[in-house]
A protein has these predicted regions:
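Hydrophobic helix-coil surface modules that form long, contiguous segments used
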Residues: 1-108, 137, 357-358
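Active-site-adjacent bridging/hinge elements
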Residues: 18-23, 81-82, 105-115, 165-180, ...
Length: 691
């Protein structure tokens, strides 16, 4: 790669384990070079981490990074990395904590391609995941090492379930290693990247860190400076780790998200229990073969204390599920136990297991694995919403909600022990996660129930929410250390709940945060929270924010995103108006994703408005974008590809727009391929988990 222009530079050195000094230089426009320090420091950190974690030293004397401000491009060119400005520039005044995380993840990903992508690359397009899935796994490991591993894992799985699980369940389902493709751009999918990363992670779980490292070292030794296949990666991991991965390789060839059913039959008199597991691979033609599924598991007693999990062969940490049906006999159980399954999300599967609301609340309070603790809470929240949405329910259904409300109070009381994890444990799953549990889901009814449950929980814990909100205030200059960032995150979660109570004081506080809050994280979070409510404070906050930051394009993306995610009625029309305004440019990829990506991908309530306005708007946008940047259309259509999963009226309205797009002359091959898939593919049910 080559780049030329009137760039300013900022440089530093990294000294590797052999004592060699490597010059790192970031190039950007003069007006933005001051915002590149975090990027430069990230490059130093990822270089050091890759050498320590995987033994991969940088192989040149210098590394150049170009901040691209005019094109939507991030590339891992050897020695000259290109990064979009949206994923490269950050400063304490105008960037949120999430912006810093994004810079770290994207910059880390592109650097890590030096070994998994450049020195060892993929042989052909069908092997894309050997490069992208492996590197995505590595960038996740890097990000986890730089922050809270539990929170990073929760964030990763939340995104996986929202995007990739939906892809697996809809018209766009395809294997990680596809057998064919119509347009190359359609290969750059959540399945290839994110499910591909989860497959590598499963190998890591099965082998353990030391054997996995030996296998990856062997992979580099065998294939350095060579194009490779997925099979060659698996063979190196198997040979280096001393495992047979023949069955494991099926993960790359079978589409869909597997479902694992777990049942515990306990015999108190004999102090034993039968752990029964079955797996179901949702392949349309029933040709799916049993997969190798590593499930991290554990047991908790009735008071929340860990109980050793073992059989006649010894302690069990990971259950290696290889058969369609498998039974394990557990021994030495002196009390009734609750099963904690898929800790750390060790396998990308849906787990179905019978657990009461009280069991889930106990796990939410006492589980030692951060991810499993969060997952139990998400299940309890989903149950509460589903119970409230039942047509014969009068008011809020008490049973799951009572357990949730009490656990919520305990979480707030104990939140100071780990602000970052507490913020995740208290956060509700979005409406789409609830809708995925129901055939022919009525999103409008579920949205009403979702709001009712959140409002009930907030009102029942009003004083504790205010106490936690005020305790997380940090005086003095803005700090980027993990503790300060965690306090800001928890404070924002509390404010979001406080606004649900329709309290004038909460609205006034949120407006004050927008007007004079310390840092962009605080201001942006308050703006996003206010935008869900049709009130004077919302209008004032939007006006103040726009006037203050109108000259800062990256900050104004936050302003656009806040409105795109708004829950109150008429969202499609408001977003359409913004998209037609002079300030918006569809060809500007970061701006388009902030407004349109947020609305079409994330706003389940506004997009699925009963009048079909969201669907018509999406079809218009896809046809317009297809003429400008056809490779980008697929990123806006995940919800449209799930059109069969909603109630009859919404499904019909979505199908009408799909047929309109498909019947339009001159559309690109990529868009035509996706519309053909949408109309031809059957429905694959993929509930997120039932307990």
């Amino acid at each position: 790669a080559i780049a030329a222009g009137p760039y300013a530079q900022v440089s530093d050195h990294h000294v590797d384990g052999a004592g060699r000094s490597i010059l790192i230089t970031v190039h950007a426009s003069a007006g933005n070079i001051a915002r590149c320090r975090f990027l430069l420091d990230t490059m130093k950190r990822v270089m050091a981490w890759d050498e320590e974690a995987f033994g991969r030293r940088y192989d040149l004397d210098c590394l150049n990074v170009l901040v691209v401000e005019t094109h939507a491009i991030s590339q891992e060119n050897k020695g000259l990395i290109f990064l979009e400005a949206a994923y490269a520039l950050a400063d304490a005044e105008t960037s949120t904590d999430e912006d810093f995380d994004l810079v770290e993840r994207i910059a880390g990903h592109e650097y890590l391609h030096n070994w998994t992508g450049n020195r060892v690359t993929c042989r052909d397009w069908f092997q894309l995941s050997v490069k992208e899935g492996l590197t995505r796994f590595r960038d996740q490991m890097f990000s986890a090492a730089m922050s809270s591993p539990d929170v990073k894992r929760i964030t990763t799985v939340r995104n996986l379930r929202t995007n990739q699980f939906a892809e697996d369940a809809g018209a766009g389902a395809h294997p990680v290693q596809p057998k064919s493709y119509g347009a190359v751009s359609n290969l750059y999918s959540g399945t290839v990247y994110d499910k591909g990363a989860e497959i590598v992670r499963m190998a890591y779980v099965l082998l353990g860190s030391e054997r996995f490292r030996r296998g990856l070292d062997l992979f580099f030794a065998r294939h350095d400076l060579s194009p490779v296949t997925i099979e060659q990666l698996l063979q190196a991991l198997a040979d280096g780790g001393g495992e047979d991965f023949a069955q494991f390789a099926r993960w790359y060839h079978q589409p869909g998200t597997p479902r694992v059913h777990v049942r515990l039959r306990q015999d108190p008199d004999r102090r034993i229990a039968r752990l029964e597991l079955t797996q179901d691979v949702p392949v349309e033609d029933k040709s799916g073969m049993p997969l190798r599924v590593p499930l991290r598991m554990g047991l908790l007693g009735k008071h929340g204390r860990p109980v050793p999990m073992k059989n006649e062969e010894g302690p069990i940490d990971v259950v290696d599920l290889t058969e369609a049906e498998q039974v394990i006999e557990l021994q030495d159980l002196d009390e009734s136990v609750i099963v904690s399954c898929n800790r750390g999300f060790s396998a990308p599967v849906v787990v179905e297991i019978e657990r009461s609301s009280e069991d889930l609340a106990l796990l939410l309070r006492h589980e030692t694995d951060g991810f499993a603790r969060w997952d139990a809470g998400q299940e309890l929240m989903v149950r509460s919403v589903l119970a409230q949405a039942e047509p014969d329910g009068a008011g809020v259904s008490p049973r799951p909600l009572e357990a949730l409300t009490a656990a919520f109070a305990d979480l707030l009381q104990a939140s100071s022990a780990d602000h970052a994890l507490a913020a995740e444990l208290l956060s509700f799953p979005h409406v789409g996660m609830v809708a995925e549990r129901i055939d022919e889901a009525d999103v409008g009814k579920l949205a009403t129930a979702w709001i009712d449950v959140r409002r009930h929980v907030a009102a029942a814990n009003l004083n504790a929410l205010w106490t936690t909100f005020h305790s997380c205030r940090a005086p003095g200059p803005i700090s980027l250390d993990p503790a300060a960032r965690a306090r800001r995150r928890l404070r924002s979660v509390c404010l979001d709940y406080l606004l649900e109570t329709d309290d004038h004081t909460a609205r006034a506080v949120a407006l004050a945060e927008v007007e004079a809050g310390a840092g962009m994280t605080t201001q942006s979070a308050a703006l996003h929270a206010l935008c869900h409510f049709d009130c004077n404070e919302r209008d004032r906050a939007l006006d103040v924010f726009q006037k203050r930051w109108s000259e800062k394009a990256d900050v104004m993306r936050l302003w656009l995103r806040a409105q795109a995610l708004s829950r109150f009625p008429g969202a499609a029309d408001r977003v359409r108006t913004l998209a037609a305004s002079p300030m918006f440019n569809l060809a500007n990829a970061p701006q388009a994703m902030a407004l349109l990506g947020s609305f079409f991908r994330q706003n389940r309530i506004g997009f699925h408005a009963s009048d079909g306005s969201g669907y018509r708007f999406l079809a218009d946008t896809l046809l317009q974008l297809d003429r400008i940047r056809p490779q980008s259309t697929r990123w806006l259509m995940p919800q449209l590809m799930l059109w069969r999963r909603f109630d009859a009226d919404r499904s019909a309205k979505m199908k009408e727009q799909i047929m309109r797009i498909a019947g339009t002359e001159g559309i690109s091959a990529a868009l035509a391929e996706n519309m053909a898939r949408a109309l031809a593919a059957p429905l694959l049910r993929q509930e997120q988990g039932r307990s």
